[in-house]
Amino acid sequence: MIDEAVRAVRARTKVVPDVAIILGTGLGGLADEVAVETRIPYGEIPGFPLSTVESHAGELLVGTLAGRRVVAMRGRFHVYEGYTPQHIGLPVRVLQRLGARTLLVSNACGGMHPLWNRGDLMLIADHINLLGSNPLVGPNDDRLGPRFPDMSEAYDSGLRALARGVALERGITLREGVYVAVTGPNLETRAEYRMLRTMGADVVGMSTVPEVITAVHMGMKVLGVSIITDQCLPDALAPTSVEQIIAVARGAEPALAALVGGVLERLN
């Protein structure tokens, strides 16, 4: 299926991307920064799942951003939509086969750190997988990666240092911490937020981890950035909605675009 998907994309474009980008909830507008050479709906790529979530357009963009050849997923997939981690990881395998060696992932998340605010960006230093499964479960294809990939540096330290430098130079507030992935689609209870915080997580979301595990399995370097869209403090918890989450994510897009653009400009 990977080969079929790669052939379908290559039939539409000859661009060989350096960098792959996955845009999460409310962040599709960042795709407007891409000088698009080719636009391919997911439904026209064999094996690609289809996005069913509001604000996930469901198309692959090939073009340039900040002087780099990029392939960008405008919309991603989630376990709560009924997809397995293997389904979610397949597009990453396609992006890597198209030529991308670096993966930039973004997401909207709930913030559990008491000193962080809505709209802040957080550099993902590490993650906790509470999805209950893993994209590498099942027979391993040694052509794609090792049976037991090391995850001690899932989020590349060099890319994180680069992002910190860009944020400092451009005056962008950039936190750094641990992302925990849960299945959703419901938001968490007060007790669950307390548990996740005790485990060492700073933010919580419903995506990203399957794609990152898949990318690391294939030898890609990964940079992850979360936008904190709601504050998940158990003792001061207020109801929120998807509409509010999307609005905060979109409000933070200029900062995310500036950060991503700066990182791309400085990549070796």
Regions found by a protein language model. Give the residues of each.
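A C-terminal functional module that forms or caps the active site or interfaces directly
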Residues: 187-232
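His/Asp/Glu-rich mid-to-C-terminal helical/loop segments that flank catalytic regions of hydrolases
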Residues: 232-268
